[in-house]
Amino acid sequence: MFERNQKTIFVLDHTRYFSIASEEYISMDFLKGKPSADGGATGAAGNATGSGGSQFSKSLWTCACESSIEYCRVVWDLFPGKKHVRFIVSDTAAHIVNTWRPSTQNMAHVMNAMLIVGVPSRNVPTSSDYSVIHGLRAAIEALAEPTDEQLAAMADFGTDELPRIPNKGRVICITSARDNTSMKSLEDIFNTVLVQQNTLAAPPSKKGLVIDHCHLVILNIVPLGVESLVTNRSLLKISPLLDVEIHTVSAPDISYKLTHLILNHYDLASTTVTNIPMKEEQNANSSANYDVEILHSRRAHSITCGPDFSLPTSIKQGATYETVTLKWCTPRGCGSADLQPCLGQFLVTPVDVTSRPSSCLINFLLNGRSVLLEMPRKTGSKATSHMLSARGGEIFVHSLCITRSCMDEAPSITDGPGGRVSDYRTAELGQLIKMSRVVPLKVKDPSAPPLTRRLPRYFPLTTSSSILFHLQRHISWLPHFLHLLVKEDMDKQDEVRCQQHIHELYKSASRGDVLPFTHTNGARLKLSKAKDQYRLLYRELEQLIQLNATTMHHKNLLESLQSLRAAYGDAPLKSEPGASLLRTYTESPLSPERLEPISSVGASGSSSSNSLLKASKRRMSSCGQRSLLDIISSAERSQSNKRLDFSGRLCTPLGQVAKLYPDFGTKDKDTVTTGASITPNVKEESVRS
């Protein structure tokens, strides 16, 4: 409740130095040819000044007052009655401008008090009595004073429980120091006074509240174009009670600096509404697009932006902070039927309240109109992310729901990331959940199987991704067969039944019966031949039995199925018991003939495919007994045997290095040897190479 930004105190340096000009000159033009009461004196003056123009510059004091008052205006607009700002003017003494009372926490009171204070006089002699230290001492005393909220919290506790009330604050001191040594002196004095104040507030005296923590921000102001010897410094912890940061800024840029600071002090965000159509002030028949910058809570952007959206940001000229750029959209009436589903609403205040575009936008919203703001996505399209509207004389920004709203219907399970999937096994999943319920027992049963064995090991989510579970709707005995396969306590009778069903599948495959598929749009059902369908069926059935092979009966079924696959040409024989089972099938008078492997269309294609299949089987059987290094080495040896080796390596004895071009460079041999004697050597070398 009592955060550090609840109390903010501005300490303004009112010494003689702040009476000098900021060196930022503003041009001023007079209207020409207008008659005045003094017989045209104004017109003459206008002609005189109109040719050359006139300029003036604000003082350092004016720049400090304007920017600090704008700071408190933003705070009071966005947090009315919740956040408090005080002003203290320091020269020969500390002058209190306002208090924590709500009656003095308004713009009218502060501006009237600043008008009475006035600009520092240049005629005042330089004296050590003029110092900003008086204001810093008064600021620490003001932090120890309770606000109305703290007084209400203190009323709920006894007198012995006053230290339980949190008391934190921030002091923003606008001054001008010569160098870092002077700035260090200010920090030490402030820290010393802070410790002394907490000593006075501690029992038994209890003069005010104990200050838990203070954040001191020192703004060192210099005229435009003047270099300062004070260096900038980020937030530094001086003591457990005090954090200090220092900023050196020119007088014309102090407003941008305070706007940047207020974003972090109150967790605010800046939004620039672009492409606002407005009539030209000088030409009412034409219009131009303007931009208006507004401030609001940072949550207005954070709760809207998702992973598929990005906030377009930019940096305003002269500023150092980022602003989110949103585009003006078609205005709508602020009726109940036009309100969009929103995630939150937050108060809004313009940065430059006196500019013409800001006043036009404010009046437009206060007249009962609403404005939609567009935010571009990463893909390039735009989305309406925010809306500006006014109610009760206050302007709000609404964060619209750009994703699926909570008021919409729940998304259909068929609208998954892979497209429309309509064959989910929803009913089977519900039965599986009921069968997999776990109930705690008072006494642990040591003979009970572990939980991992009882969990399902194979469950296709869709019907089209499975052959077994797709056919159970069309083959009457298949559901009971699948139920027997996953039983934990399979007995001999269940094994015999499963053997009969497997034998029935084998007879259907031998007759060439097509499996009763209703559709073949699954990835595994694209093959239309009966043999291929049965081969896929056997593979999935073997996978299901392997995952549930917890008893000897399951293992017997697995061996018999592997023997069937071997007879079908899909897998080699695994063991001797499987071969015996295969012989019992084939030697029976009712058993079908042994199925041949799949062949291509045409006589020539069948012979080539059979040879390739046999060769691949031989390679796979041989690869199972060799390592990967042996396979690669044999492949390299087979390639190297196709070409002759280098002649130098063949002629050189083992263990020695072959010399390349041994006759190269011997001039005597080249001159003595005739061309006839060289020719056989060349031929011999060419033959060797």
Swiss-Prot record:
Keywords: Cell cycle, Cell division, Coiled coil, Cytoplasm, Developmental protein, Differentiation, Meiosis, Mitosis, Nucleus, Phosphoprotein, Spermatogenesis. Phosphorylated. Residues 592-619, 665-689 are annotated as: Disordered. One of its GO terms (biological process) is regulation of mitotic cell cycle. Residues 521-550 form a coiled coil. GO terms for cellular component: cytoplasm; INTAC complex; integrator complex; nucleus; perinuclear region of cytoplasm. Belongs to the Integrator subunit 13 family. This is Protein asunder. It comes from Drosophila melanogaster (Fruit fly). The gene is Asun.
